[in-house]
């Protein structure tokens, strides 16, 4: 995922959500450069976040989403993780599919 994004943008985006409780997916996606990407590239980033390659991003993987962008990214709090999941999980199955992720990135 990192090779599709600019290091400066990643740093800026991570700095913006450094404080616990400050994570906002819309702001983060825009700052990190995801929003400007094609659907295809967004799906490549999804695959990088989907650590177990299940085809879904589960709540556990979502907690560590910032680490997919940089090793020093913090863990999301439980509240942030749940809010992120709720925003993305359109079909209510408790996890985020690749199309749900792409929709979430581009709807903001």
Swiss-Prot record:
Ca(2+) 1 binds at residues 50, 52, 54, 56, 58, 61. Ca(2+) 2 binds at residues 89, 91, 93, 95, 100. One of its GO terms (molecular function) is calcium ion binding. The keyword Repeat applies. One of its GO terms (cellular component) is cytoplasm. Keywords: Acetylation, Calcium, Metal-binding, Muscle protein, Repeat. It holds the Pfam family EF-hand_7. Residues 37-72, 76-108 form the EF-hand domain. It comes from the Eukaryota. The modification N-acetylalanine is found at residue 1. In muscle, parvalbumin is thought to be involved in relaxation after contraction. It binds two calcium ions. This is the major component, having an isoelectric point of 5.0. Belongs to the parvalbumin family. This is Parvalbumin alpha.
